[in-house]
Amino acid sequence: MSRGRRLRSPSVAERIATSGVADKIDRVSTVEQTSASRTIDVLDHGFVRLDDVMADDLSVVNAARVSFARRKEAMDDSDGGLIRFLMRERHGTPFEHNSFRFHVRAPIFVAREWFRPRIGSYNEFSMRYAKATDEFYVPAPEDVRTQVGKPGSYSFEPVDDELAQATRDELAAVYAAAFAAYERLVEQGVARELARAVMPVGAYTEFYWTVNARALMNFISLRAAETAQREIRRYADAVELLFAEHMPVTYEAFVAAGRVSP
């Protein structure tokens, strides 16, 4: 067993204050802590829940040191240096021997952006087998925006209050009409797998996502970036916060390396 000085575990507040996550906290809503899970509410009806976790910084250290037939029971200062070296030199496999399982509720269009990198394992709610719910994403007034510029070189700007409210009203009306059509079709005997075709991509879905730290960092680098759509950035911010809590040394090395997965 190593005789090096054991690292003091910084508090969540300390990690957030020094990691850059603090700038993003206002993008996510309330946080619920229970003995079984950690939940962050996102958007109007969504959430990210850390359903299960088998991950810490020591798992990275031991995965790397197994090449030398070494194993440690606790972190010390040298281990932080090792993790930073692995991150900086892009030695990625030691970051794969761990697991996070998330339960997510998000609009369908967010879920499709989430699945696109195809990292991790997914199981999603199916409107083929279960009745659809009438929960839909209606953006907050400040999130209604207009696109300025050309594709590949554009920015988003807020709209005036009148257009923001008109947009919200229009979305709510479309959602109500779509769900009413869905219910009519089901009541008339149309199979759910076909009736679901009328449901818009603003409808909420749920899924489980199991992922290791290396893939998780890749997701964060893509979906928490300023170029990602605002709605999925809110979810990525929540995922990032939960990742930082469980693997603080790895997370700090990730940020120091330019937020690029090894």
Model-derived features with residue positions:
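Family-specific signature for flavin-dependent thymidylate synthase
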Residues: 2-262
